Amino acid sequence: MDFVATFHTHLSALMTERALKKAGFTARMAPVPRQLSSSCGTCVFYTAPDLCRDALDEDTERVYAVNGECYSLLLDSEE
């Protein structure tokens, strides 16, 4: 399944990308898509069988499932 995670800080995005790659998943940092908003403007796109909560940094803002150009909110740290 494909996901995109947004973050409160750029460092959090970097740490999450590294943790996901270390766990063997495909991950890449990128600018946040226009349809989404985030504090730092950087996101991580990744492919994994589930959210991989253990790899997400504590400053993760939101995680969305990605289906083409559509995003479905799965996790919101503000709630």
Question: Where do the language-model regions lie?
Answer:
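Amphipathic, hydrophobic secondary-structure cores in small proteins
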Residues: 1-47
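C-terminal structural segments of small proteins and small subunits
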Residues: 48-79
